[in-house]
Structure formats: C-alpha cells, structure tokens
Swiss-Prot record:
Protein name: tRNA modification GTPase MnmE
Function (record text): Exhibits a very high intrinsic GTPase hydrolysis rate. Involved in the addition of a carboxymethylaminomethyl (cmnm) group at the wobble position (U34) of certain tRNAs, forming tRNA-cmnm(5)s(2)U34.
Record-listed Mg(2+) binding positions: S236, T257
Source organism: Borreliella afzelii (strain PKo) (Borrelia afzelii)
Xref: Gene3D superfamilies: P-loop containing nucleotide triphosphate hydrolases (3.40.50.300), Probable tRNA modification gtpase trme, domain 1 (3.30.1360.120), tRNA modification GTPase MnmE domain 2 (1.20.120.430)
Highest rank taxon of the organism: Bacteria
Keywords: Cytoplasm, GTP-binding, Hydrolase, Magnesium, Metal-binding, Nucleotide-binding, Potassium, tRNA processing
Residues that coordinate or bind GTP: 232-237, 251-257, 276-279
InterPro entries: G_TrmE, GTP-bd, GTP-bd_TrmE_N, GTPase_MnmE, MnmE_dom2, MnmE_helical, P-loop_NTPase, Small_GTP-bd
Residue positions binding (6S)-5-formyl-5,6,7,8-tetrahydrofolate: R27, E90, K129, K464
Main EC class the enzyme belongs to: hydrolase
Quaternary organization: Homodimer. Heterotetramer of two MnmE and two MnmG subunits.
Coiled-coil annotated spans: none
Length: 464
C-alpha cells in the first residue's frame, strides 16, 4: 500500500474552494464514517438505518455548546456503491468560511482525520472503481485550460484510454500464450501458429499513442503569440481586445508598457499565450533596456508575432529595422493600425513594397473594430501548421508518466521485433513479451509501485 495513504481510517475534506459562496461540499469516507457523522447530525437515528444513495435534511450540531451550526443536506452512500467503495457521507452546507471551519472541526472531534490530497481518488483506485488512467483523467478535467482539453479528458474518464491499452496488452498476451505453448510442450513451431502480426499491429498502435502526446502539448501549453511594434502603435489596445477586458494600460503617452504583460485566451479550442511587449525603441535607462531585451527574446521564441504599425504616423527607426530584417518571415503578421485616422501614404506604400508576402499584411482599426474579423482569420491561417485537427473521441496521451511507460513499451517492442527477425530462442521472446505486458499494466495501474502511486496522487486537489 502507498506510503502516503497507509491508514484505512475515516477521512474528511472540503471538496469545494475555501471561499464564501452559496454552497459548499464537505465529503467523508471510511468504514465508520456514517456512525461517526451521525453523532453531529440532528436526524442521527434515521441516518444510521438509511439505505445507501439517499438524501437527508437536518442540522449539524455542536453538542458541546448545545447549538446548531448549519442547516444542511446530507448525501449518504453505503459500501461498495460509492466513489471510494466505502461508506461515505457528503454534506452540502452554506458556503460560509466560518461555517466550514466549524463543521470540519466537528468532524475531526468525532474521530475523522483530514484527508491528504488525492486520497479519495486513491481509495477509489484501491477499490477498483477506477484505473490509473481514469484517476489522471479526473485531475485533467479539474485543471483543463481549454474546452478541447476538457472534452478529451472526459473521453478518457469514460475509459477510452484503458480500453485502448487493454486491447494492445491482449495482443501481446496472445503472442505470449502461443510462444508459451511452444515452450511448455516442446512442439515443432511449424505446428503452432505464432501470431507475429500482433506484435507489428501493437507497434503501430503504440506509436499513435506516443505521437498524440505532441498534440496534447500544443493543446495544454498553447501557442505563443507576441504583440510587438513601436511605442503607442496600439499593441496594448489589441492585447485588451483579444482578452475582451482591460489588462494593459492604454494611454496616448508613448512607452506606457515598460516590460511585457502576459495573459491567455482561447480561439477555436486552442490556447494562446499572449504577450504585450515593451515598445521597440532606443531606451534611455537600464530598466527600459531590460524590458526591450525581454521583448526581443520573446519575439524570437514566438509561434506567431503580430507587429503593429501606426499607419497615421511616420515609420520609426525601429519599424524600419524590424521590417527590413523580417520582411520574408512567415511567422510575422504586419498589422497597419489606426485606419480610422488620416492614413500616412508614405508609411503604407513603404510597408506594402517591403513585405514580400502580401497575405501577411492587413489594415485595421482597433478603435472602430474594423478589420478585426480578417485579423482573426489571418491568425487561424498562420498557426495552421501548429493546429492539429482532432475529434472528441480521439485518445490523447496527456501525462508524463504515461508517455514514459509508452515509450518504454515501444522500445521493448522494437527489440522484440529485432529478436524475431534474428530468430532468437523463444524463451527470450517470451521474456520480452512479459516485460511489455508489465509495462502496459503500469499505465492502467494493474502493475504499480508504491513510489509511482505516491508521486501521482499527491498532485491531486484536496478533497479529490
């Protein structure tokens, strides 16, 4: 059993944020959880005799001070029909910070202890209610940053990844069974149909899962979009437009943004990490120079750069330098802003004649929202190489633990195929096949070490 959760006692934790809110949920689990909780519940006799999966109304009682603490609704579960597989009580109370403290304190005085992060999910795993892929999916649902990431996590919660891993494992097991028959009964291998094709098929399926991790990284980590340009060109206004709220300071004074500001937004299910950089210019002091150096570094690392130019003014020296060095750069979108003002024809003509790819140049007015739809379409086009079209039923690997085990299994399969080609002894083939099966079993938790379980579940939320 895991070192983190070595006691099979009664546990309690707040399952909702510790904030003032309309309602909160306090969950508990353990063999004696119902009888212990009934001591602080007004309708205790009905609770002790109630069937599982029932709801009860009453009050939390502070018996020492002979007073009511809160009016609550209690959800009662009896083993094995609960998330943890144990008797369990969930209290729905008013979301008062003071009330939450009082109720949990009464739980602790009644013999419960505070649960560790992830301990409820760990008990569910021990009770075989979920496998490790489902446990990880629960955490992914909670921390999903985009609608796409959320939907993919829900798909895994339904058991899709477990089924896929189990299917591959059964293919290897069928191969191992055939080889074992040959070894156990010493029959001629010509009399046995050794399913070598199952190993080849498993190799293909494992490679698909491994490649899917790259898709997840793009979904989870997002695409870096940097706003650059000379001071007062409209970068901060565009930044706020993307976010649909004010995060950057917008003023008529040049150089308002001295460093960079970071935020994120979602477009078509893709997460964008947005940076509003310090305006490119000759800095007068050390702090400004540092900010501009950071801006230049971000521009180099970005997936996409929107370079904003004030089309109502003359080009700055920094505009000219940037255009000259990036006129053929496919990841730069030149945006001529402020078309609501009088257009500086020399600025427009110079930019149009300098930028080699005219499709990477658009004119907009952030103030009047003119050309903004075109801007979004351009962004979609320019990051198309980063986008991966996936369906909600697709299986995506999302944890470093899973990808490490899949890569290990894939390496073992390549080694097994090499040995098959070299016609090595069947006992060596059987050993390798067994290693692959164990490796796949670690992904689902059928084979697992205490250290792996400790490391995985301690990263969960308290109350999960």
């Amino acid at each position: 059993m895991s070192k983190l959760f070595e006691r099979d006692d009664d546990i309690v934790a707040l399952a909702t944020p510790f904030l003032s809110s309309a309602l909160c949920v306090i969950r508990s689990s353990g063999a004696s959880s119902i009888s212990k909780f009934s001591k602080i519940f007004s309708n205790h006799s009905a609770l002790n005799s109630a069937a599982g999966n029932t709801i009860h109304y009453g009050y939390i009682l502070d018996n020492e001070n002979n007073c009511k603490v809160d009016e609550v609704v209690v959800c009662l579960y009896r083993a094995p029909k609960s998330f943890t597989g144990q008797d369990a009580v969930e209290v729905i109370a008013h979301g008062s910070v003071i009330g939450i403290k009082k109720i949990i304190d009464l739980f602790l005085k009644s013999g419960f202890r505070m649960a560790e992060p992830g301990e409820f999910t760990f008990r569910s795993f021990l009770a075989k209610k979920i496998d490790l892929t489902k446990a990880e999916a629960i955490n992914e649902i909670i921390f999903a940053k985009t609608n796409k990431a959320y939907s993919l996590a829900v798909n895994k919660l339904s058991g899709a990844l477990f089924v896929k891993i189990d299917t591959i494992k059964k293919c290897i097991l069928n191969f191992l069974s055939a080889v074992s028959v040959y070894l156990d009964y010493e029959v001629d291998d010509r009399e046995i149909d050794i399913p070598f094709d199952l190993i080849l098929n498993s190799k293909v399926e494992l490679k698909k899962l491994i490649d899917s991790y790259k898709v997840y990284e793009k979904i989870d980590h997002g695409i870096t979009l940097v706003l650059a340009g000379s001071v007062n060109a409209g970068k901060s206004s565009l930044f706020n437009l993307f976010l649909k709220k004010d995060r950057s300071i917008v003023s008529s004074y040049p150089g308002t943004t001295r460093d960079y500001i970071e935020a994120s937004f979602e477009l078509d299910g893709i997460l964008f990490n947005l940076f509003d950089t310090a305006g490119l210019r000759d800095a007068d002091n050390f702090v400004e120079r540092l900010g501009i150096e950071k801006s230049n570094s971000l521009i180099k690392e970005a997936s996409l750069v929107i370079y904003v130019i004030d089309i109502s003014s003359n080009l700055t020296r920094d505009d000219l330098l940037f255009i000259d060095s990036n006129k053929s750069n496919s990841k730069i979108l030149f945006v001529l802003n402020k078309i609501d003002l009088k257009i500086n024809k020399s600025t427009e003509e110079f930019v149009r004649s300098s930028v080699l790819n005219s499709s990477n140049l658009i004119m907009i007015s952030i103030k009047n929202l003119e050309g903004i739809d075109i801007l979004y379409d351009k962004i979609r086009t320019l990051i198309s190489y980063e986008r991966v079209e996936i369906g909600l039923d697709d299986i995506i690997i999302s944890s470093s633990r899973q990808i490490q085990l899949l890569e290990k299994a894939y390496a073992l399969i390549l080694d097994l195929l090499s040995k098959i080609d070299r016609q090595v002894s069947y006992d060596m083939l059987a050993f390798d096949a067994y290693e692959i099966i164990n490796c796949l079993g670690e992904i689902t938790g059928e084979v697992s070490s205490e250290d792996v379980l400790d490391n995985m579940f301690k990263n969960f939320c308290l109350g999960k």
